[in-house]
Amino acid sequence: MEKWNKNIRFILLTGVLILSSSTFGRTSKCDFIVDSLCYEILSEEDHTVGVSYDYYGNYIPELKYRCPTRELVIPDTVVFNGTKYAVTEISSHGFEDLFSIPSVKLPNTLKKINDNGLCQAFSSDELFLPPSVEYLGMFALINRNLKKVNLEHVKYFGNNALSYTSLTEAFIRKNVEYGTAVFFKCSKLEKAVIEEGITKLPMYTFRICENLSKVELPSSLTDIGNFAFDGCAFDSITLPQNVTILRRGLFSENHRLKNIVLPEKVDSIEYWVFLNCYALESILFPANVRYINEKAIHFFKEPDDPTPQIKDIYCEGTTPPKEGCYVEGVTLHVPKGCKEIYATTDNWAKYGENIVDDIDLSGIHNSQVISNDSDAPAYDLQGRKVAHPKQGEIYIQGGRKVMR
């Protein structure tokens, strides 16, 4: 049953992308043809057009299933019936699947690349976007070869706009609109920086970015969407203090995640947040947490899966969070004097004799004072490992806040 659920999950989540890509029409409108390119008049008043290539032979039968083999140069302007039009858009599906084009030179008049406009359209690993381009539609630049593209002028990124590219860094900018799954399955992505001032990160933004090992989150961030970091590769992360909900699948399938620092304000932890986080050794749920889904921490336990490393769960709440998650073989640490209430509440009761009431909440900032000779690795409050902890400083150690 677990394996079936795992497969269904993959189908449901990836199906969103597949269906979205295939259910829209692949034919662009063509009002006139010049030099084997089709043009759609957008505005007679402004004299603007969108451009596409008739790969399916709807308007130019001799081009059916034939791809250009030289650099594609799209002009700034084109003349038809004595009127000069500015080329301001790549039409939806305009140059989709023209794999044989070595490179594309875009017009300086271009403002928009519409849905699927340059999806798998060229073999080059680099694309220059004119400064005038401010809009990338859904699936606009999907291309496994693409390693470098200038995006600083873009104000709108549609769903999956840069999915499946080979970019190595991502910079999420404030005052820019991002759809879902913009960097979905960018397998070469190693670093992501979300600019200060951003409050929301859409769902699936970095889903299955399997080499994403460094993430910088701003203090302004308050809402992170479902599965935003599913399948990533960082070993530690500190969430901003104003994040209150850990949404579905947020860190699922991150097999390297060992340490995470949760904000004091977190009050709800949803389904599969830590699904198959095999490297996670321990976790501390702050006192403010009111709800933890029963499968917030969950492992499928298929024959070829790694052995989960988690040994300890720490709950600072004197009132057990509703529902609660049970992980076999794990010790549940609760505040002193709270063993009985956890032992008789929801899924927490399943821990039985593995409930230990050893959390002392009387220390400064709810931290515990430990000796300097502790063997457990220490992390600062930003989730970075500290080789030589300083006396009097607060760290995360063994899943707990501690003071040296």
Regions found by a protein language model. Give the residues of each.
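LRR flanking "cap" motifs
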Residues: C30-E96, T180-S187, K191, L250
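C-terminal tail/sorting-segment detector
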Residues: I394-R404
